[in-house]
Each structure stands twice: as structure tokens, then as C-alpha cells.
Amino acid sequence: QLNATFYSGTCPNASAIVRSTIQQAFQSDTRIGASLIRLHFHDCFVDGCDASILLDDSGSIQSEKNAGPNANSARGFNVVDNIKTALENTCPGVVSCSDILALASEASVSLTGGPSWTVLLGRRDSLTANLAGANSAIPSPFEGLSNITSKFSAVGLNTNDLVALSGAHTFGRARCGVFNNRLFNFSGTNGPDPTLNSTLLSSLQQLCPQNGSASTITNLDLSTPDAFDNNYFANLQSNNGLLQSDQELFSTLGSATIAVVTSFASNQTLFFQAFAQSMINMGNISPLTGSNGEIRLDCKKVDGS
């Protein structure tokens, strides 16, 4: 059972150390908060929140970093390593890499204007990775709402969690390659996605021409790209969602998600409360506790390897 005081006797400053390291990282990288919370998300959806996403290729381990949802896009690993080093210097062998991801997510959100919440702790780190699981379990920006809802449901998260957690796209960037399917030939129609605002469409077509680079990046939230707020939901209401998986939350006819988007768009406090609770819910997915797993000394590799 995870709890808020897990390190109070062994590493009381753990949370403060994580926070100050991330504060430092923000100085040179305004998108680091979004990158760190995404690592936690992509970790938790694959065999639970066990830091399996952080393991590099080695021996029998096929790294999840090479999975489609992570290759060329998962980032922030260096900051996780910096946090781990700082923690090892203060309380060696105590704080798990999976707990670092949970703490880093809360710090990333609260440092950018979003809510704070009490992070439950006590996760341990996996001894292996699951490349196939990362390829199949992580929701894709190209998927329809029903598929994405099923993937959330498979890890015990409901429609409210889905909409709240999607709100993390209030900050961070996305590459042309994850939304250019909407720009020219959407689902074989030879035209753009009809749910994409025409002004945004023209600017994205210029940014991401048909034979252009798939790795050019743009803001997920065109109004306040680096602030954690509820503007993401207002963007959906004006068809300014960047990803297909974003816009479908509001544009899928008859979907239960529409009312949730509407309520979050009109009430930031409500969104912040829901987001904090859904982050706790996501952080509770199948953690390794007790004597399961280990406390990795280096987040990139299993101890003794």
C-alpha cells in the first residue's frame, strides 16, 4: 500500500530535492515538465508504475525506449538521472526511480501554475522492461476515442480520468508526425480533418508540409503553451485541439467526454481537483511494493548489471 510518508524517516527531503532539480532544469528547458509527466504516464500504462520505461537495452532487456510511442519522443531521462544522483548523494539506496517519476510529475505541474497534490510513495522498480507492452498498451494520438477509452479502462481509469489526464496537453510540444495525418488526407478522405479549426489548419500545413520533416515540433496548447491551466479544454471547444486524440474528446458525437470537457473549460478549479485525483489514480496502477522489485541505484539499469 502506497502512502504519503513512506520516506519521512529515511529521506525526508526527497520531495524537495526532486523539486529543486526540476526547477533548475526548467531554466534551460521550458518543456521539461511536460516531458517528465509523460514518462510517468508511459511508464504506468505498461505493467504499472515500475520505472520500466527508464531501463536501457542490455542483455535480456529490450528497452521500452524503442517502442513506437517512445522512440524519438520520450525525453527527460537526463533530468531523472540528475534527480537520482542528488537523492543518492543524500540518502543512498532509498528512493526508487518509479517514485521519482511520480514526484517529478507533481513538481512539474505545480511549478507551471497547476495544482499540487500529496504524492503517495513506496513503489519499487522493475527488474525487466516490456517492449511489446509499450507498443500495445499506450494510447496513440491516431486512435479513436473508443480505443483510447478501452486502454484507460484496462488499467482501471474511467472517462473522467481520461479527460482530466488529457488536460496535461495544456503544456508541452508534439511533432508533426503525430498530427500530420489530420492535415491533408485524413482517414483516406483526400482532405483535412473536418474537426480542425481552419486557421490552425493553414498554419499547421505551412509548418508541416506533406514531404516535410516529421520531427518539427509545435505547441500542444496554442494559447498558453508553457502554463498548466484549463485553456486546453477551451481550445477543444473551438476545434483547436492539436492531436486527433485531443479533439475527439469534444467532437465525438454523443460521447460522455463532451460534458466533462465543457465543465473543465468553464471551471479551472474543478479541472485542477479532478487532475490531481486522476494523477493519484494513475500513480496507483499495479505498483511493486514490499519485497517485489528493487530500488535501482541507477535508473537506466537493473542493480548488479
Swiss-Prot record:
PROSITE patterns: PEROXIDASE_1, PEROXIDASE_2, PEROXIDASE_4. Glycans are attached at residues 3, 13, 147, 185, 197, 211, 267. The modification Pyrrolidone carboxylic acid is found at residue 1. One of its GO terms (biological process) is hydrogen peroxide catabolic process. The active site is at residue 42. Substrate binds at residue 139. Ca(2+) 2 binds at residues 170, 221, 224, 229. Heme b binds at residue 169. The keyword Metal-binding applies. Binds 2 calcium ions per subunit. Binds 1 heme b (iron(II)-protoporphyrin IX) group per subunit. Its cofactor is Ca(2+); heme b. The keyword Oxidoreductase applies. It comes from the Eukaryota. The record marks 38 as: Transition state stabilizer. It catalyses: 2 a phenolic donor + H2O2 = 2 a phenolic radical donor + 2 H2O. It holds the Pfam family peroxidase. Its EC number is 1.11.1.7. Belongs to the peroxidase family. Classical plant (class III) peroxidase subfamily. PANTHER family: PEROXIDASE 53, PEROXIDASE 72-RELATED. Removal of H(2)O(2), oxidation of toxic reductants, biosynthesis and degradation of lignin, suberization, auxin catabolism, response to environmental stresses such as wounding, pathogen attack and oxidative stress. These functions might be dependent on each isozyme/isoform in each plant tissue. This is Peroxidase A2. The lineage of its organism: Eukaryota, Viridiplantae, Streptophyta, Embryophyta, Tracheophyta.
